[in-house]
């Protein structure tokens, strides 16, 4: 096997902290070529070299440029801010009140806010302007003949002012609330961002340099939280 074609380091995810727990070489992905001839060995090395090149290009495309490969806390500017799903609330209904209003031919149409204007009910003087009070009844807009009687309809159907549907619908009414975070989240990252940020690392000639230059993240017993290697000072 050519030493110039290393086996990639596979990152593991720490879900409680949202960090990478470390990386180790995945020897299970290596092809068995011990009984192969020189031609087969060359083809195997070609496949491994192509795989490493693809991983390097993928890391360059999806990884965020940062000084520290595996930071213990990600700033909010580099963390994917997921939008929470909207909250749906079932609106309460008073079936008994709806039936009573329908039977009595009640009409709901608009509303007014009571405002006082310095000891008088309106901003205009009652003597200068004659107010015309208009009273009316809602009508049902359908294919039936509109009744001109002043009393409630015999079928108890009434019109909600400003709406095209009469009476109360038996269907339930829901209120959808869009929830959003008031402050961007920082700290750990999610699984989707982890897959994009921590592509299997290709570390060339891992054992050819000084021991102090070897990345701590590639040591199996490395602790990403304390940034130390278990068993070493």
UniProtKB/Swiss-Prot annotation:
Pfam family, one: Adeno_PVIII
Keywords tagged on the record: Capsid protein, Host nucleus, Late protein, Phosphoprotein, Virion
Residue positions, PTM Phosphoserine: 180
InterPro entries from the UniProt entry: Adeno_PVIII
Annotated propeptide span(s): 112-163
Protein name, entry field: Pre-hexon-linking protein VIII
Subunit annotation: Interacts with the peripentonal hexons as well as the hexons in the facets. Part of a complex composed of the core-capsid bridging protein, the endosome lysis protein VI and the hexon-linking protein VIII; these interactions bridge the virus core to the capsid.
Originating organism: Human adenovirus F serotype 40 (HAdV-40)
Family statement drawn from the similarity comment of this UniProt entry: Belongs to the adenoviridae hexon-linking protein family.
GO CC annotation terms, alphabetical: host cell nucleus; viral capsid
Single annotated GO MF: hexon binding
Post-translational modification: Cleaved by the viral protease during virion maturation. May cause the middle segment to be shed from the capsid.
Site (Cleavage): 111-112, 163-164
Keyword Phosphoprotein: yes
Residues recorded with modification Phosphothreonine: 64
Note: All late proteins expressed from the major late promoter are produced by alternative splicing and alternative polyadenylation of the same gene giving rise to non-overlapping ORFs. A leader sequence is present in the N-terminus of all these mRNAs and is recognized by the viral shutoff protein to provide expression although conventional translation via ribosome scanning from the cap has been shut off in the host cell.
Induction per the UniProt record: Expressed in the late phase of the viral replicative cycle.
